[in-house]
Amino acid sequence: MGRIKENQSKKKTLLRDSKAYSDQAAAAVTSSDDGFDEPKEITAPKRKLPCGNSDAKKKKFKHPEANVKPPTLEEIKEIRDTRNLFHSNLFKLQVKEMLEELQLKPKYSNYIENWLETFTTAVHEFQDGLLDNCQLEVPLHLHKKLFNFQFLTPTAEPKLIGAAAIGTLLGPKLVVDVALEMPEKCFQKEDYRNLIFDQKRALYLATVASKLKELPACAADHFAYNYHANNPLKPVLELTPTGKIGKHLSLRLYITAPKAIFKLSRFVPWNNNVRPSFFGDKWDESETLPSTQHYNANVLFDLTLAENQKLLLSTFSGHRNFQEGLLLLKVWLRQRQLDVGFSGFSAHILAAYIVYLKQNRLLHQSSSSYQVARTVWNQLANSDWTQGITLCPQQPHQLSTLAGYYDVCFMDVTGYYNICANLPLSVYKAVCAEAKLAVELLNDVRVNSFSQIFMQASPLYTRMDNILKITNPATVDQLLELHVQPQVKYDYANYAHPQLLKLLTDLLQKGLGKRVHAILPLETASKSWTVDTKAPIIGRSLTLGLILDPEHAFEVLDKGPATNEDAEGAAEFRKFWGEKSNLRRFQDGSITEAVVWAAVTDAPSKKRLIVRQIVLHLLEQHLQLEQSDVHYIAGELDIIYSLTSSFKVAKLQTKLKLEQETDAEAVTPLVIHCYDALARQLHTLGDLPLDIVSISGISPVFRYCEPQPLLPQARLVADRMHAGHVLRVIIQLGPSGKWPNELGALRSLKTAFLIQIGKQLKEQQHLHTQLCKEGLLVLKQGYCFLLELAHTKEVALLKQQQTERGVTAYVDNAASREIERRHYILPRVSGALHALHQSHSTFGPTVLIAKRWLATQMIDDGLWPSIATELLVAHLFQQRQMPHTTVAPQTGFIRFLQLLAHSDWASELFLLNFNNSWTEQQITDLEHSYRSERDSYPALCLATAYDQQHAGRLWTTDDCPSKPVLGRVTLLARHALQLIESSLLSPSLGFVRPAQLFIASGEGYDLVIELKPDLLPNTLCYDLGSPFLPFSQRNFRLPLAGIDQLAKIVQQLRSAYSEYAAFFYNPHGGKELAIVWRPASEFAPKPFKVNELQACTPCSVGKVQVVRDTLVEDFKLLLKDFYLRICTPEQLKREQRSHNKPKRYFDDQSEPDVDKPQKKKKKKGTVTKPTDLKKRLKKSKSLSALC
C-alpha cells in the first residue's frame, strides 16, 4: 500500500484511478499518442471593431429579438425528437457526446486507405507457384489429405469487409477486416467435401503471408495467425503495424472464395459433406448419411460473404444514422461480453438485423441513431428466431424446414446461409433478455439509464450463479470418445468445444429443468500465434455458467410421475436419476418416484449447494465423471462467515439448537426470534406512564448484515454484564405534553423511564437488566440488548440556539443529525434492508462477505462505515443492470467488487429509492444539487428515500471514508477482481482460494505494533490468519457489554495523530496495528508557533520538529496494557523465513511475583525429580484493559 497523501494532487490521482474501464470503448479513437502528428491549430486573426460608433451599439441591442435567426428545420426536428424520444435532455447529450467520441478520426481512415492501396498493388505482383516455396506454417491443425496445390495470383481486388466497410469501427483497438478472394481455378469439383475447401484456404493464407513478409513495406510489421470467432476452420492473418499506431490498429486478412465454384444447394442443412471415412469411421451404406448443417454453414460463410457485404453496404454506406445506431448497439453488446467466441452473438448479426428491420419497414431511412438502437432492442425483446427469419426476398426453402436443423435461424440474402448457425438458443435468449431490460430502463423516467446501458461493464461471469469447468484433457477425451454421438462429430468437423457444449447443456437442462434460467458458455477470445509456429489446438475445455431461478433453484425435492398413473414415465424417471430416486408417499396420499436433495430445515448455505449436488450427480450417473474430474464453482466464499472450528458450540449453556458447522446467516433468525419475543414482552408492560408506540432494532443483525456469528453466550459475571455484541433497540413512547423543555431534564426523565422499564422487566419477565450511559442493557436467552428511548423533542432541543438578539433559532448540527439518524431514519432504513433480504435472500450473505473482505484488508469502521457497505450492496440489488438478480452470495460479492473498482466516486451519486418513495422531481432536484454543489457532499455520497433534508450527507462524512481511503479500496478491489477473473477464465485453474482474497497484503506499511493476544478476543468467524503474525493462542473471553477498548484507542490515535500517521487494523480479531507515516514534509523542521506545537520537539533555534520516535512512545502510552512490541514488516518477514520465533507474550517465563504468597519450601531430605520448566501463558496483570 502506498503512502496516504494529504495534498490535493494525490487525492485527485486516486479518484482518477477509480474511473470505470468501460470508457475503453472510445479510448482508441480519442487518443493523441497514436503514432500520428496532430495538425497544428490555426487561429484566425481577430477582426477589429470600430470603437467610435456608440449609436450603432445602442441600435444593436435595442431590439435583440430582431437579430435572432429563426430555428432551422433540423433544429426543430431535433427539439421534437428530444421531447418525444428521450425522457431527459441529459440522456440525449450523453448519447451525442459518446457518438462524437466514437467517430473514426481522419488519420485512421487515411491510413487504412493507403494500406489497402499498397496491399492491392502487392497482390497484383504476386507470382504463381507451388506450396513448396512457402516457408511458414499452415494455420490449420487437421490431418490433411494429400493433394497438390498451386498458388494462383488473385484476380479480384482485396476489399474491406465488416465494420471497416460500413463505417462502424469500434475501439479501444481498431480491427480492420480485409477479404482476399481466391481464384476460381484453385478449386476442383469435389473440394466441397471432407474439409478440402478449408485446407486450401489455409494453404493459400500461408502462401500470402509468406509473400507479404518478403515485401519491404511489410517487413517491419508483426505477422501472426488467429482464429475468427474461435473457429479452427477459419484462420486469419493478423498484421500489426510497427510503431505507436500498432497500439491502436491492426488488420486481419480473410481468404474467401467466389460464389460460383460450388452450387449453394450442395450446402443445404440436410446434406452431408463430411464422410465418416474421413475420420476412419465405418458407416452402414444402407443408412442415410447424417446431416452436417454446421459444417455446411461454415463453408457458406465464405461463399456468400461478398453478396452479404453488398447488402450491408447498401443499407449503411452514406447513412450516418444507421452507422451510429449500430455503434450504440455494439457498445451495449460488448459491455455484456455476449459477442465473444464460437457461440457469441456477433455484431454482424446486429447489422444484418438492422437490414431486416429496414426491409420490413420497421425502420425508416430517416430514423435517428437512437431510434435505430431502440427499435432493435424493442424488436429483439419480443422476437422468436427459432421459427426462422430471412433476408432473402424469395426464400428457396421453407423457413420451418431450415429452422429444424438449428437452434436459431436467420437466413442471409441468398437464402442458404444461416447467419446464426453457431448461436446456441441460450445465448440468443440471453441477448433478448438484455434487450428487454434496455427497453425497460429507457422507459423508466426516474433514472438516468445511460450509464447502466452503455458505460457500466458487466462481464458475463458476473452474471453466473454457478460455474462448471471441465479442463482435464483426459476427461475431455473420455467425453468425446464415449458419449458424443458420431453425427455430432461429423457436423462440427471434430471441433471439441461445440460437441462438449451440446452434450453438457442437453444433459443439465433436462436434469435441472426449471431450476435454471439459462446455461451459457463462457468463452475467451483465442490468442494469436506467430506465423512460423504450428497452429494450437483450441476448444479442449468447456466452461459453463448457470443462471439460477430463485423460485425453484433451492427446492429440496424433485417429484416424478406416479407409478400407477404413468408407469413408463416413472421408469424413465428412475433410469435418469439412478439410485437417488426412491418411491415415496406424500401427505396428499400420492405415491410417486422422488429425489430428495436436502432437508427442509437445512441452513440456507447448504440449500444453495443443491444445484451443485444435482450437477455432480448427473455427471457421475450419465457421463461417469468423478467430482475430481471437474471444477464446480459455488459457495467457495461461504466459509468466510462460518463459525470457526476452534469455538465449541457444545460448551454453550443454551436451549437453542445450534450446530457446530453453522454460520452467521444461519444463527441470525435465532437472534431475530429472541428480539421479537423481547418486543412482545415490552409491549405487555402495563405500569408505564406512557405506552410504547414502536420498537425497532437497528443493529446490523436485524437486517441480516452481521458477519460475526452471534451465539447466545452473553452472561452476568459478578453482577456485570459481559457480551461480545450488544444489540441496539430503539423504543418510541406515546405523545405527551409533559416532557420538559430543557435538554438535561429531558434526558433525566428518559433515564427514569428506562429504570422503570428495567424494574418491570425484572419483576414481570424475570430478565436481568443493567443501566448504562447509553441506555438499558437487557439479558435474554444469552443475547444482550441495549434499549434506547427516542423522543422528537430531544432533536428539537439539540437544534435550539439563541441568537445575539435573543431569538430562538433551530439549526442543524452534528449532534442533532446523529440523534435523528439513529432514532428515526436508521430504523426505517433497517426495515427496508430487512425487507430487501426477504425478497432477495442473497442480499444478507453478500453483505457478510463484503464486510469480512473490508475488515481483512484492515479497513475498519473508522475508515469505512459498515452501513455504507450495506447500502452499496443494496444499491446493487435495487438497480436493474442485469436481467436476473443473483442468488449466489459469491456472485453478489464479485459485483460489489466491480462497483468498488469501476465507480467514479467524484461524479456518482448512489440513490436508494426504497418503495419508490421519492418522486421524479425530488430525484431531479437532488441530482442537480449534487452536481452544482459537489464540494459540499462527502467523497462517497449515499442517499436513501428516508434521509429527508440530509440526503447525501447522512451515512458518510468527508473523513469517513476519505478520498485516499476510497482510492485504496478501489485499488484493492481491482486487484481482487484480477485474481478472480484470471482463475475463472483460466483453462487449468478452479476458483481463487479464499486466503488469496481475505488476507491483506503486508506491503507498504512502515511499522507494526503487536498487541497482547490474551487481551483481544478472537473472531468467531473462520480466521484465515494475519499478513504479519502467525496464529496465536485462541481467546474467546467476553468483554464487558458495549465496550470495545481497542476501537476507542485507535479512534484516539487518529484524532490526535492523523496529521502524521495513518492507522489500520482488522476489527474482526486482529492482533496488530499497522502504521503508515505521512510524507517526509510533515516531519521537516518548521518555525515555532504557539498554536502548532502538538507532538513537536525543539530541534534548533526558533524551530521545532515532529520526531517519529517520540510519536511511537506516545502510541505506546495510549495503547497501555495492549502494547506488546513494535517492529517493521521486514523484521517480521525475516523472523518467518528463519523460523526463529521471537519471544512471544504467551511464551514468557513467568517470574515469582513479590505480591503473591510464596509456596512453602519442601523439607530437606525429600527427593524430587528434576522437571523442565514448562512454558505457559502469562496473563496480563491489568485486566482492566477489558473494561
UniProtKB/Swiss-Prot annotation:
Here the segments flagged for biased composition (Basic and acidic residues) are 1-20
Q: Where would you find this protein in the cell? A: Nucleus, Nucleolus; Chromosome
Gene Ontology MF terms: RNA binding
Keyword annotations:
Chromosome, Nucleus, RNA-binding
GO BP field = ribosomal small subunit biogenesis; rRNA processing; tRNA export from nucleus
| A GO CC term assigned to this protein in UniProt | condensed nuclear chromosome
Q: Where is this region: Disordered?
A: 1-64, 1134-1187
Please tell me whether the keyword NADP is annotated for this protein: no
Q: Does the keyword ATP-binding apply?
A: no
InterPro entries xref list: NOL6/Upt22, Nrap_D1, Nrap_D2, Nrap_D3, Nrap_D4, Nrap_D5, Nrap_D6
Subunit composition and interactions: Part of the small subunit (SSU) processome, composed of more than 70 proteins and the RNA chaperone small nucleolar RNA (snoRNA) U3.
The UniProt entry's sequence similarity note says: Belongs to the NRAP family.
Record function comment: Part of the small subunit (SSU) processome, first precursor of the small eukaryotic ribosomal subunit. During the assembly of the SSU processome in the nucleolus, many ribosome biogenesis factors, an RNA chaperone and ribosomal proteins associate with the nascent pre-rRNA and work in concert to generate RNA folding, modifications, rearrangements and cleavage as well as targeted degradation of pre-ribosomal RNA by the RNA exosome.
Q: What is this protein called?
A: Nucleolar protein 6
